[in-house]
Amino acid sequence: MGALLVISLFTISALAVAQNDLPVARKDQDTKQAYAAAEAGIADYFFHLSQDNAYWGKCTGVPAPTAVNQAWNGVGADTRTNSRLIAGSSAWYTIELLPANGATSCSAGNAQNTMIDANTGTFRIRATGHSRTAKRSIVATFKRKNFLDYLYFTDYETADPTWYTLDTNGHATRSGTSPTWTGPDYVTWGSQNCPVYWRQGRGNLGYTGQIFQGSPASWQTFVDNCTEIQFAPNDKINGPFHTNDEILVCGTPTFGRNAQDRVEVSGPGWRGNGGCSGNSPNFVGTWTPNAPLLTLPPTDNSLSTVAGSSYRFTGRTTIVLNGANMTVTNATMGLNNVSMALPANGVIWVANGSCGQGYNPLDPYNAPQGCADVYVQGSYGSDLTIGSEKDIIVNGNLTKSGDTMLGLIANNFVRVYHPETHNDANDATNCTNQAGVMTNVSIDAAILSLQHSFTVDNYYCGTPLGTLTVNGVIGQKFRGPVGRGNGQSVINGYTKNYNYDDRMRFRSPPHFLDPIQAAWRISRYTEQIPPR
């Protein structure tokens, strides 16, 4: 209501200026009032779109009062029957939905194909303002700018410092000077120092301290740095790409599917791995260095106020999706394979109870029951967003049924389930896959890790697991590993097969954009001459 009031006051003010612009001719005054009315029409539509990201898809079936009409071709009687009068003025405006892709009108049953330009992901409206006999038209183009524009998004192209415990095999580290050793351990040092961009000097950072290991165990010199992750020769990013950092390249990885896929880095460019030969990335998409930063919010806790009371859970939760229903297990809440319909508003929220710890990469499945670890698998038949105050663990294929969308948003990690058996307490990488481990996993989802990474548990263990296919988007604070390679061969974990879901350019899972406050914006604003 406040925003609408501002719009009304702005419009009245603009009209007042026009009305007091004396001694101009009556025609000139009316022309100015007509333009101000057209601006008010654009502001009116933008206000409603800001309140409801799906407003455009309702075509003319929006709540009254409304000035929204199907497009009029200018021939015959004017079909724009919906209009709004400017408060305190005789000026008024109409709004038209300008169809795309050769369509003649916006169809609520097929809004995607009739309103959204297939090449740009944008849509257009026309507002025409009238004052007496004068009229003027403005065409506005709307587009989203957020991480859903990209198949792949990272804030930092360095490994999550949580994984640094793997470099120490879980052994204690210390730094500082003897005998007090008041400096941080290696993992803490990484968390404090490595979340900076490469252009800010991350490559010059180093940790010097001691590690307690050996037989018999003793304190020994330990030196390490921030862990960089490269794009390998066979890596393919099948969609638009953005990192706030810059990329490390080994060989000739491929970025983008065509020139319409932007390949953006906020740094000055890319750098080659000195241990690889022929470093030359294949930019099929449009290479764009020095791109503006995109900022992730710190949490997704706002989803807790959106989810209905029956769809707010606490502690470890297992969800198996099955079409329009789901089966839920949650010991904290006394639920054991309880069948439920998917939520009407499409939002599920899982909060921490009594937790007290984060992700332990060397022992990922022993977190307290009160931790918001959400295990999810299955096939979903309606749009859905699952949010977690801690982690989301995909423990089976996650696939869509029909034209549906799934969002997975975790404050911490989004993980792929991979249990293993450790064979040597002193070597974390000496481990094997457990029986029945998942191979060739498929995930149809928009994935967002706000504070950490999308990763595979125990990615460094066992024989290769086939292909990890993600159809959607992947957004993460730190680069998350899903396997290990030797040259062009995968030796542990998964081979990546990441593909952009082009629907994400103009659609989103329910309330998925709320945590990052992404919305439609006006990307172009031009007057149409002659007016319609």
Regions found by a protein language model. Name each.
Residues 2-37:
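Aliphatic-rich helix starts adjacent to a transmembrane/signal segment
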Residues 1-7, 513, 521:
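N-terminal segment of the canonical double-stranded RNA-binding domain
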Residues 54, 62, 75, 91, ...:
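N-terminal periplasmic/intermembrane-space "pro-region" immediately following the signal or transit peptide
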